[in-house]
């Protein structure tokens, strides 16, 4: 039987704090490493995943293997392109898919780098820079409807997690403000998650990397006008 950890989701959402619209200034490899998230930090996206060891859902990328470094072209120091992805093992009864890329910063805040929802369950892969495979939500890194490429100003290796959720029904976001943020998506997913799969990627900014001006979509308040 699928054991779910979603019972704590409502409480987690109430306490969810997102970072300011800029990439983190502090480095860190993760829990236990200097500069990593504080002890007891709650990873809100991870908390939504069901604890199903028998799940067949698998998320991969032809550009990067799980646990390896994200190629430069998919970061803010390269092309800022979103990575190509593929998945297999979508469970029977799946009616919708959700994709979230996030990072737990040194202050324990969940940063959303990529949010795609209402993905057709028949979809099995997406190309580099794809935007037409679902609906895109807000990236909290820059407060824009976009894929926010890893571009941290802080030193050290950082981990970013892409999670694919298989849902038994489309998340009801009819009452959510537009453009959509991750909070209502996670809330609407409650009780509908059949399976979830992660792809963990790492990135360390090159020494002496300079800031560059990037063409970006309008911020949330600008997009609403």
Which residue ranges define each predicted feature?
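Bacterial N-terminal signal peptides
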Residues: 7-17
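Positively charged n-region of N-terminal signal peptides that target proteins for export
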Residues: 1-5
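N-terminus-centered regions that define maturation/targeting leaders and the start
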Residues: 21-225
């Amino acid at each position: 039987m699928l054991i779910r950890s979603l019972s704590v989701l409502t409480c987690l959402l109430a306490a969810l704090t997102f970072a300011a619209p800029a990439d983190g200034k502090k480095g860190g490899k993760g829990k236990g490493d200097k500069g990593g998230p504080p002890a007891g930090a709650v990873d809100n996206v991870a908390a939504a995943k069901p604890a199903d060891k028998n799940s067949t859902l698998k998320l991969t990328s032809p550009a990067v293997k799980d646990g390896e470094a994200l190629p430069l072209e998919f970061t803010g120091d390269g092309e800022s392109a979103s990575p190509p992805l593929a998945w297999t093992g979508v469970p029977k009864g799946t009616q919708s898919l959700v994709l979230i890329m996030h990072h737990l910063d040194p202050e324990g805040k969940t940063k959303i780098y990529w949010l795609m929802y209402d993905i057709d369950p028949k979809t099995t892969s997406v190309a580099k820079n794809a935007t037409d495979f679902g609906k895109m939500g807000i990236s909290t890194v820059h407060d824009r409807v976009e894929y926010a490429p890893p571009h941290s100003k802080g030193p050290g290796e950082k981990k970013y997690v892409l999670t694919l959720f298989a849902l038994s029904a489309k998340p009801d976001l009819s009452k959510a403000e537009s453009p959509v943020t991750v909070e209502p998506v996670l809330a609407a997913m409650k009780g509908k998650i059949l399976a979830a799969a992660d792809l963990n990627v790492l990135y360390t900014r090159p020494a002496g990397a300079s800031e560059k001006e990037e063409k970006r979509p309008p911020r949330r308040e600008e997009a609403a006008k």
